[in-house]
Amino acid sequence: MCITSLKNQKEFELINKLGQKFYERYFILVIAKKLPKIFLESKYNTFLGIKVSRKLNKKAVVRNKIKRRIRHLMRIIVNDSSVKAIKFAIIIIPRKGFEEINFSHLNYELSKIILRNI
């Protein structure tokens, strides 16, 4: 696997500043193709940040399920041969209704945006 998570607030702020934002019905994406030096020296190709607020759902179980779904979706997308060699960072912020939407529809929407903009 060539995915690692964004670890601290500084990394999130850096990607927010450098990245391009895409607003969809069920999520917001921030994709940064031009990465700073600290990311380029890493052995990983993809850096993933997930922000699931308490506003989305009060229960931690549901928020953790959303995070698991997002990580699984990203594994599927990154294992695609056209994305493996590219270094990029992405922050995914789910919106209301994310937990009810069909997994295949989420996969389609997320992969469409990522593959088009990388």
Curated annotation (Swiss-Prot):
It catalyses: Endonucleolytic cleavage of RNA, removing 5'-extranucleotides from tRNA precursor. Consists of a catalytic RNA component (M1 or rnpB) and a protein subunit. GO terms for molecular function: 3'-tRNA processing endoribonuclease activity; ribonuclease P activity; tRNA binding. Belongs to the RnpA family. RNaseP catalyzes the removal of the 5'-leader sequence from pre-tRNA to produce the mature 5'-terminus. It can also cleave other RNA substrates such as 4.5S RNA. The protein component plays an auxiliary but essential role in vivo by binding to the 5'-leader sequence and broadening the substrate specificity of the ribozyme. The keyword Transmembrane helix does not apply. Keywords: Endonuclease, Hydrolase, Nuclease, RNA-binding, tRNA processing. One of its GO terms (cellular component) is ribonuclease P complex. Pfam families: Ribonuclease_P (PF00825). This is Ribonuclease P protein component. Its EC number is 3.1.26.5. It comes from the Bacteria. It is an enzyme of class 3 (hydrolase). GO terms for biological process: tRNA 5'-leader removal.
